[in-house]
């Protein structure tokens, strides 16, 4: 496979941008080799600057649930852009998307649009503290809530419970109020509440962990968190930036039947354009300026292009049969991957929920980030390169979930499973 143009462009980029990329995972550091530079995307496919075609299971890290460059989304954007790219003032499209989100997501009575998942999580943390008058927050090892200082506490390490920062430039004082617990461990959460009486503003988590691979909540875990937070006067926050509108139209909270107090969103609700949102109970959201005293603002928040793409994407997802198709596609894919790994004699555990999937090259079960670290990352790197050679683009990390879309066909899944068979045999 010729990637000479990708290599040349990435080589030049390294002198222009730190590491040659605008987001670290794109640099392929954890899988080896040089990153692929894309030229265009359409449906379930991506083409690089050398003309190589890939079946894509990243989907722009989640937003492309209808497939890349869906013609109805593109048409709506072409019409919208003629009216301007950003107003810096209210637009009616905000109302439309807000109503769609409120109608779909059980916890959301009011919503505020921002420009990224990180922004949404930053704002919701401030809101949790403002509403409760408390400073401490519990997060879980392996759960990612953006790159804001207060969430950059190293997951799964010996210092995690001490609230020490995971990046230079983050003062210890900033993360001192960030408490961590292993995912799926209710007893650890109970202990943190006992050790910090009347001091914890809330608990935030990915209801399905997608930034430590793919880890599902065990039966009773989410329900237990709901009970604990109510008992201690704390708020429960679901970070649904990844799961929102992906595993069901109402997100993970609708799928699992557990309603948090607040929810953060992103990715799908922008249809591939930069977007984020947070929402929840009306009494809590009433704290947000200008209705209340908790300040948060954004130059491009609620811009007409992101709103347009989000509206059209949600309209497409609401069509009958959308999530049934996504579920069938993903289940067929993960079953095929498992069969291929077993045939090659490799340890494997994996699963899926609707249009989200993941696997580990280790024996299961994987309940938390500590379990996930048992995966064979070196072998995954070899697997990733082997799959690229066979025209399949997976997330360039052993600790990221994968995504399917409405555009993936049965033929795409069959071709992907065949590529896994050959690649697993190669790396076994």
UniProtKB/Swiss-Prot annotation:
This protein's UniProt keywords: Chlorophyll biosynthesis, Cytoplasm, Isomerase, Porphyrin biosynthesis, Pyridoxal phosphate
Pathway: Porphyrin-containing compound metabolism; protoporphyrin-IX biosynthesis; 5-aminolevulinate from L-glutamyl-tRNA(Glu): step 2/2; Porphyrin-containing compound metabolism; chlorophyll biosynthesis
GO terms under cellular component: cytoplasm
Cysteine pairs bridged by disulfides in the record: none
Repeat as UniProt keyword: no
Residues with N6-(pyridoxal phosphate)lysine modification: 267
Protein EC: 5.4.3.8
Principal place of residence: cytoplasm
Main enzyme class: isomerase
Gene Ontology biological-process annotations: chlorophyll biosynthetic process; protoporphyrinogen IX biosynthetic process
Annotated Pfam families: Aminotran_3 (PF00202)
Localization annotation: Cytoplasm
Co-factor(s): pyridoxal 5'-phosphate
CDD domains membership: OAT_like (cd00610)
GO MF annotation, one: transaminase activity
Superkingdom assignment: Bacteria
InterPro entries registered for this protein in UniProt: 4pyrrol_synth_GluAld_NH2Trfase, Aminotrans_3, Aminotrans_3_PPA_site, PyrdxlP-dep_Trfase, PyrdxlP-dep_Trfase_major, PyrdxlP-dep_Trfase_small
Reaction catalysis annotation: (S)-4-amino-5-oxopentanoate = 5-aminolevulinate
Quaternary structure and partners: Homodimer.
Family recorded in the similarity comment: Belongs to the class-III pyridoxal-phosphate-dependent aminotransferase family. HemL subfamily.
UniProt-recorded name of the protein: Glutamate-1-semialdehyde 2,1-aminomutase
């Amino acid at each position: 496979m010729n990637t000479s143009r990708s290599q040349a462009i990435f080589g030049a980029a390294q002198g222009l941008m730190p590491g040659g990329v605008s987001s670290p995972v794109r640099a392929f550091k954890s899988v080896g080799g040089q990153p692929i530079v894309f030229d265009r995307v359409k449906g379930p496919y991506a083409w690089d600057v050398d003309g190589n075609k890939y079946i894509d299971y990243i989907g722009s890290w989640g937003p492309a649930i209808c497939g890349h460059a869906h013609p109805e989304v593109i048409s709506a954007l072409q019409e919208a852009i003629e009216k301007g790219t950003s107003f810096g003032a209210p637009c009616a499209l905000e109302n439309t998307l807000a109503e769609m989100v409120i109608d779909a997501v059980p916890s959301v009575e009011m919503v505020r649009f921002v420009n990224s998942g990180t922004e949404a999580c930053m704002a919701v943390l401030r809101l949790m503290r403002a509403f409760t008058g408390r400073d401490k927050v519990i997060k879980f090892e392996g759960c990612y809530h953006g790159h804001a200082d207060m969430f950059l506490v190293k997951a799964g390490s010996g210092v995690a419970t001490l609230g020490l920062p995971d990046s230079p430039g983050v003062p210890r004082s900033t993360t001192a109020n960030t408490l961590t617990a292993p995912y799926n461990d209710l007893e650890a959460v109970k202990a943190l509440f006992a050790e910090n009486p009347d001091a914890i503003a809330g608990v935030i988590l990915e209801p399905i962990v997608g930034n430590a691979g793919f880890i599902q909540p065990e039966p009773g875990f989410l329900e237990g968190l709901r009970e604990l937070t109510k008992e201690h006067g704390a708020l429960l926050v679901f970070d649904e930036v990844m799961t929102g509108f992906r595993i069901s139209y109402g997100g993970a909270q609708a799928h699992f039947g557990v309603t948090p107090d607040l929810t953060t969103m992103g990715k799908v609700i922008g249809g591939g354009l930069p977007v984020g949102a947070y929402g929840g109970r009306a009494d809590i959201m009433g704290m947000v300026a200008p209705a209340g005293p908790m300040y948060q603002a954004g130059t491009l928040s609620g811009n007409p292009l992101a709103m347009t793409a989000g509206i059209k994407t949600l309209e497409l997802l609401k069509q009958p049969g959308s999530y049934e198709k996504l579920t069938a596609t993903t289940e067929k894919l993960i079953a095929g991957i498992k069969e291929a790994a077993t045939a090659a004699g490799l340890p494997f555990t994996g699963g899926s929920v609707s249009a989200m999937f993941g696997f580990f090259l280790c024996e299961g079960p994987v309940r938390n980030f500590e379990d996930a670290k048992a995966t064979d990352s070196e072998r995954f790197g070899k697997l990733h390169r082997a799959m690229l050679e066979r025209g399949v683009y997976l997330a360039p990390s052993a600790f990221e979930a994968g995504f399917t879309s409405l555009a993936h066909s049965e033929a795409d899944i069959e071709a992907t499973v065949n590529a896994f068979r050959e690649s697993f045999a190669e790396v076994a």
